[in-house]
Amino acid sequence: MDRDFGIFSFLAVSVSAAGFFFGGFQYSFLILLSLMAIEFISTTLKETIIHKLSFKKVFARLVKKLVTLALISVCHFFDQLLNTQGSIRDLAIMFYILYESVQIVVTASSLGIPVPQMLVDLLETLKNKFKRKP
């Protein structure tokens, strides 16, 4: 009984902390987490296939994912401070969803997997919308 209480307490604290740091688990955030996992796994498997896998590369990629989540958290904090109702966080999440999607397509292409032109065009259009204007 005590063990179950400890597990549920840990889960409750974890979900509360995630809500504080990331503003909850809306679909856009869950999509981002899923794409980050897919990109991490697919790139790691690609490096395994081409015999270029190293602990240093995997660790660096993991650190980048954690820093991305930290940036999402910072955006959420700014939303709270500026009372923008999540628009800064949502924009950042959309940017990183696009980034992770492009990385997955690049990985698939480098493995020789055909990528539908419609998907390439869609990602290119979205990428152009997120580019900075001079």
Swiss-Prot record:
It is a multi-pass membrane protein. One of its GO terms (cellular component) is plasma membrane. Its main location: membrane. The lineage of its organism: Bacteria, Bacillati, Bacillota, Bacilli, Bacillales. Keywords: Cell membrane, Membrane, Transmembrane, Transmembrane helix. It holds the Pfam family Phage_holin_4_1. Belongs to the bacteriophage holin family. Cp-1 holin subfamily. The keyword Transmembrane applies. It is found in: Cell membrane. This is Uncharacterized protein YtkC. The keyword Transmembrane applies. The chain crosses the membrane at residues 5-25, 30-50, 62-82. It comes from the Bacteria.
